Amino acid sequence: MAQTHAMMSQFNGRKRVRKFFGKIPEVAEMPNLIEVQKASYDQFLMIEEPKGGRPDEGLQAVFKSVFPISDFSGTAMLEFVGYEFDLPKFDVEECRQRDLTYAAPLKVILRLIVFDIDEDTGSKDIKDIKEQGVYMGDMPLMTTNGTFIVNGTERVIVSQMHRSPGVFFDHDKGKSHSSGKLLFAARVIPYRGSWLDIEFDAKDIIYARIDRRRKIPVTSLLMALGMDGSDILSTFYDKVTYERDGEGWRVPYSVDRFKGMKLISDLIDADSGEVVAEAGKKLTVRTAKSLAEKGLKAVKVSEDDLLGCYLAEDIVNYETGEIYLEAGDEIDEKVLKILLDVRADQINILDIDHMNIGAYIRNTLKVDKNESRQDALFDIYRVMRPGEPPTIDTAEAMFHSLFFDPERYDLSAVGRVKMNLRMDLDCPDTVRVLRQEDILAVVKMLVELRDGRGEIDDIDNLGNRRVRSVGELMENQYRIGLLRMERAIKERMSSVEIDTVMPQDLINAKPAAAAVREFFGSSQLSQFMDQTNPLSEITHKRRLSALGPGGLTRERAGFEVRDVHPTHYGRICPIETPEGPNIGLINSLATFARVNKYGFIESPYRKIIDGKVTKEVIYLSAMEEAKHYVAQANSSLDSEGRFTEEFVVCRHAGEVLMAPRDHVDLMDVSPKQLVSVAAALIPFLENDDANRALMGSNMQRQAVPLVRAEAPFVGTGMEAVVARDSGAAVSAKRSGIVDQVDATRIVIRATEDLDPSKSGVDIYRLQKFQRSNQSTCINQRPLVHVGDRVEKGDIIADGPSTDLGDLALGRNVLVAFMPWNGYNYEDSILLSERIVADDVFTSIHIEEFEVAARDTKLGPEEITRDIPNVAEEALRNLDEAGIIYIGAEVQPGDILVGKITPKGESPMTPEEKLLRAIFGEKASDVRDTSMRMPPGTFGTVVEVRVFNRHGVEKDERAMAIEREEIERLAKDRDDEQSILDRNVYARLTDMLTGKVAVEGPKGFSESKKLDSTVMGRYPRSQWWQFAVEDEKLQNEIEALRKQYDESKEALQRRFMDKVEKVQRGDEMPPGVMKMVKVFVAVKRKIQPGDKMAGRHGNKGVVSRILPVEDMPFLEDGTHADIVLNPLGVPSRMNVGQILETHLGWACAGMGKKIGDLLELYQETGDILPLRQRIENLMPDDNHNEPVRQYDNESLYKLALQMKKGVSIATPVFDGAHESDINMMLEDAGLDSSGQVTLYDGRTGEPFDRPVTVGYIYMLKLHHLVDDKIHARSIGPYSLVTQQPLGGKAQFGGQRFGEMEVWALEAYGAAYTLQEMLTVKSDDVAGRTKVYEAIVRGDDTFEAGIPESFNVLVKEMRSLALNVELDDARELIAQRVLSDRVEQ
């Protein structure tokens, strides 16, 4: 991003300057791209927080939820006090090299309280309290780049998307019942605990299920909560009072009850007796209201109108207690008669009209067989624990533990918040269990839905899906570990003498440590980091997966879950997702999105106040956004920030609509906020078809880092952000001055925030030719020179695939779109030989080979140069220890590490015995098991590491490596020491200069004014002996000296620690005495069969590499680098590549013009034309670098950078338009059609018509033909079937499968078929004979019985079918003999 500084006139040439085409100013800062990972894990560990004041979240919450632990009798309790981390044993780099896990020891402070219990009263007194820190295993730490190092490999924990806890209302879409009736259901999902489902059936009875078990009527659940029948009815229904009035009944008149009713009989005023509305009339809301206004208080109804109503209360004879009718009974003729008999003059009726209010709860109550709370509890107990006889206590306890026990049931804060929102409750989010009100509210809402009021939930809405990041996943895992530990602690507390033990003795931390190890090592969400290039690392860390434990499975996930949802806007990228079975289940976070404390994804918006768009930015989740009208970032605004159009395109409640401008209250912050990082790197994304953009995003992640990285001419402005946040390019931690630079490190003397406790020196170690997880090469190169001023955040070194701090995945190459002799048929790519000769697409890959010398039963293996039966020639590259030299060129079959293994003694012939007695020949009892180069790999050895077990004597090579390492550490220490000395003595000189010293070193005459000459007479170390009169200054000098001594001591201590680590032996797997790792660098030039791609999903395979002179060329004699097929564009609809071609062409043309002016400046010394050209190119606006303020030297540096081609940025959805491209082309003096006349390289003739030519940014993908091509003659065979193995990794053969056999059968090629199925496969004896015959030069062979036939026979015998094989020739001979005998 271009930063504008008012006074900046210097350009250091260490960053790429781009011309921005974006019109929309950036309001919000893009959050750090790997913040998701770092923030989540920091919140979990809370290392920085003070031990006492940690909030209840993360690790603290886990311990708080499991502790305190009491024993079964209650005589002792183990309490949690706090936890702290010690420093990790090894730093990140050491863990990588030694295959260790980067982790810090966790120490938990526990308090054991022992009680005295009075046996008579049962009261407790504290008898004893012991507190102790207990080691609880190692907790992996996150590196600065958001990864973990587990057993030496970098891993990433992917965030998981899952269904948010809370309550969800849904229906079955009419699928369950043949009538197509919608059956509504509600589901309460806790974070952990039992699920509660409440659902309608086809008969409109409401049932509840717990944990998907057998259903029970919902009224039983309500009874179990302590309600009786009449409570339930009065909770769900209002009452209407009917009073007897002569022949009929009188009912109070209410507007709500009567509106919308069609009258069957006349409506009669009960007081006056007049008809206020005739039969057959429909009462509208207006009519109903006007009647009430006219004073209608009650209406008269006949006896018949009571039929079909339901009683709201029991009808009881109060004297005898006899119940005549029960609440909920339906009134029919019989009931009316009873009402007459008992002279009930006033009865309460349930307000059920079957239109607005249905009788579902009343009907359910009638169906329910349970009468009391006890019945209901027993019923629930039988459902949950079938086969166990219930007692009232066990049933109560079980029911309580289902939903009301914080140990067993946890809604989590999120669940409570979601529940409050959905059902308008106000319950604090600390109440994490269900309450009776919650269950009632769910049932009420479900009934409302059935009555046609309210909306069902959309489970794919991002308001109902949340993200579980590293911290939370780890928290759940650790809780499982602690719960396993809790059981063991309880048992141990009961079995030991509690007065004498310490907390340490009660705790076995193995289960907790094992849970952590299992999570990082084998969880589905802990993944081997995709480290092909910086973009793939960042994308991997920002990935959201719906798979994994507690998530979906590929097979069960339907279309809806995978689909793009309106709420994804600005939160999840609609483009970047894998092709194949995981499509839509694995997503990527959008560029500006962040995850809030509840785990919902938030997107930023600008506030609009009184129609004016402000700079104020707020983050909203999908739920909060729904009620707003959100305008797009590219809506046109006037100078005051008001909308120019009357109607604005905006989003509201998931729909896109045109809204009046005064309705709009929010606006997007940036046009790229809806896509992910990878998609935001594609220029002209808006002109590409979405499917191709998806491929483009995915293929950028597979680009191999090239030997010479080159940033794209046509970028999007995201390149620098990705390079910085991924950690590939090294940025300065503090401002300072570069003190030393070489290829492996940069030493910077800090000039800001010089905290006395911190060192005043920053040493940046650069990674040189390290192997990444994908075997690509990680190499960092310094960009600074000694004496350069560096600001905080400046890029000081480039990493893999970065160029001047910009992401650089490929190269800019000159492309012509035209067919060429069929070599670009079906997306093939025709390349020029120049690309190979100039190493344009050459990459370095580093292979790691590892060999271990073990202790075997027959004796130890040995790594040595002394290998039996190997020619001296084969050992030429090995040193005396048997390990290859660094720099040796190796090819397939070369020995990398010589190793011999003892073999079992075989009985010796007398001759051998004699020879051994004479020569002491030992070679016969060992066999050569050296590590050799695998087939197909050629390269150079770049690094060797030797690891020895503790106490095993080190060989010469190990000692040499160790010496080298210690020298390097010493150099670091000395450099830091010299800068420390320089800084401290400079400060001391400043303090002393001009002051009068009252005493000093030996031979110093008192009361002399100090200056450089006086002080220069004494060595620096004696300057501390000068004393001055000013007491305050003297104290400052003493403090400086103390600080200096402490820093020196700390430095030496650090150095000694590291040396001790280097000299100490290594942790090894059991049985391994010594291990050697050899790293071989392989240089891969591009060749036919390699896969290449652009950024727009335009992929292809190199078909041929053509001599430069045969390639088509331009009028100035420049040959095209690549020829692509024009037919690859129209059907794929990725027109972005054509626009990129034109713009790239303009950039190169412009660069050429600047190059010419640069030459002019070097000849004449006149910089004005160059300055004008560059200033015209980069107008002053909010995006561009302020080139007008550059001094001449800066301008010259900039022109040098632009000479190859001007870099531009065209942000997604806000980039260059056709008119801009035409202008650029015209400025560069090129034809605005973007087409030129091309000439055939072979004949020199011009082609028939002009051809589109320009620069495209092409990538070489990690699908290299060298990794795929494979051949075998003799190799390993499978043990059982004796057939060759398959696959390159196993050095396998080609499978001659079922269909291939059919083909040979169809041709009747019997002998070929026999050969394929026997001697070339699993006829063991036959294939040996063939080999011997070929060696003899004989080409005849005889096929035997294939081994797989014998396997078949064995299998048949195992089925008790005796199959015996008879030799056919013998059978025929016998038959012939018997025939003769008969004759």
UniProtKB/Swiss-Prot annotation:
PROSITE patterns: RNA_POL_BETA. GO terms for cellular component: DNA-directed RNA polymerase complex. The keyword Transferase applies. The RNAP catalytic core consists of 2 alpha, 1 beta, 1 beta' and 1 omega subunit. When a sigma factor is associated with the core the holoenzyme is formed, which can initiate transcription. DNA-dependent RNA polymerase catalyzes the transcription of DNA into RNA using the four ribonucleoside triphosphates as substrates. Its EC number is 2.7.7.6. Keywords: DNA-directed RNA polymerase, Nucleotidyltransferase, Transcription, Transferase. One of its GO terms (molecular function) is DNA binding. GO terms for biological process: DNA-templated transcription. It is an enzyme of class 2 (transferase). It catalyses: RNA(n) + a ribonucleoside 5'-triphosphate = RNA(n+1) + diphosphate. Belongs to the RNA polymerase beta chain family. This is DNA-directed RNA polymerase subunit beta. SUPFAM superfamilies: beta and beta-prime subunits of DNA dependent RNA-polymerase.
